[in-house]
Each structure stands twice: as C-alpha cells, then as structure tokens.
C-alpha cells in the first residue's frame, strides 16, 4: 500500500498556508458559480468578495478559511466542497491527456500554476506503483474539494485513451491533512 509519508518530506496542514500565498481568480471563480454557490457565495461576500477577476490574484488564505468554515459548519460539507471542486474544471481549458506522463506533468504543476508564493512543500504528486496510479494531495485544499475536481476532470478527459475514476484511498477525511486517491480504470 502507498504510504503518503514515503512520498512527501513535509505534510501540509489543511486550511493553512503562508500569508503571501495568492490564488488565481480563474480557479477561485468557482466559489461564486458552482452548483451550490448559494451556500458558498455568501461566505465570500461576508469577507468583502462579491466578484472575481479571472486574471487577478487573491489572498489564498481567504479561500482556505471559507473551506474550513464549511467543514466546521458540519452541514452539507462533502456535497458543497465536491461541487466547488467540480466547478473548477469548468474554468480550465483542458483536453484528453495523451499519456500518463502528460497527466503527471499537469498534476504536478497544477497547484503551482494556480497558487503563487506558496511553500515548496505544497504539491500534488502522481505515483505509479504496483500497476496503479495514485494522486497525493499535499496541499492545504480540502480533500473533498480535490475529490470533486479529480472526479469531474476524469469524467470528462481520458489519460492515454483510458477513462479513470478517483477513489479515496488513504487518509481521506475532509478535516485531515492530505490524502491519496487511487485512479481506477473504468470497466468497459
């Protein structure tokens, strides 16, 4: 079994980042437009965010605080955060990945392309082990949000012509640090 600590030097705490970390507006727009935006939009509005510029950069901790608030509310937590994650995919210009190497490059650059000024320890990692593909979430982003993101992306796009589904594999609770997702090939 894949053990997260074998692949990551320092585990990132969920919902915490450095003060200078900023998130790209195009990614964060999902908080205002996702399927359950009636729940997420007011949480941003009370923090003074009513509109987002897709080309702008915003304090990343604000969005982590909203995620944390949703988790602490204990109301529709998974459903809300999965909806936000799925909504992110709508804002990205993606296409099928021709190979696992292309997918791995995308995954490993994803967090760094959408968040700047972050600690080097924050990342997503793809591991190929025992004929399986795993994604490690070592970011402060909710595991439920990342599950929604991977679910929607892999629903729409294939890797090397194969469709996959993310399966929570290890350390999954949404209020814990990091997790591992197993990418399971769809049965035809």
Question: What are the residue ranges of the model-derived segments?
Answer:
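Short terminal or interdomain "cap/linker" segment that borders an active site or interface and mediates
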Residues: 2, 115-143, 157-188
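Generic signature of intrinsically disordered, low-complexity segments enriched in small/polar residues
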Residues: 18, 29-30, 34, 61-66, ...
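Terminal low-complexity, intrinsically disordered regions
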Residues: 1-74
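Hydrophobic (often cysteine-bearing) scaffold residues that line and stabilize catalytic clefts
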Residues: 146
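Conserved short hydrophobic interaction patches
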Residues: 149-157
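Amphipathic interaction/junction segments at domain boundaries or subunit interfaces
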Residues: 47-143
């Amino acid at each position: 079994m894949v053990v997260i600590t074998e692949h990551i030097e320092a585990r990132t705490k969920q919902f915490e980042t450095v003060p200078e970390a900023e998130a790209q507006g195009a990614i964060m727009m999902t908080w205002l437009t996702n399927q359950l935006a009636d729940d997420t939009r007011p949480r941003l509005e009370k923090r003074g965010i009513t509109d987002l510029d897709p080309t702008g950069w915003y304090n990343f901790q604000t969005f982590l605080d909203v995620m944390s608030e949703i988790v602490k509310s204990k109301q529709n937590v998974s459903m809300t955060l999965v909806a936000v994650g799925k909504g992110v995919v709508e804002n990205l210009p993606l296409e099928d990945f021709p190979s696992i190497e292309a997918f791995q490059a995308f995954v490993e650059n994803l967090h760094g392309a959408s968040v700047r000024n972050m600690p080097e320890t924050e990342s997503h990692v793809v591991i190929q082990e025992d004929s399986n593909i795993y994604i490690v979430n070592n970011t402060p982003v909710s595991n439920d949000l990342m599950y929604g993101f991977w679910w929607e992306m892999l629903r729409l796009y294939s890797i090397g012509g194969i469709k996959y589904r993310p399966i929570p594999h290890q350390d999954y609770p949404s209020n814990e640090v990091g997790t591992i997702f197993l990418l399971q090939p769809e049965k035809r």
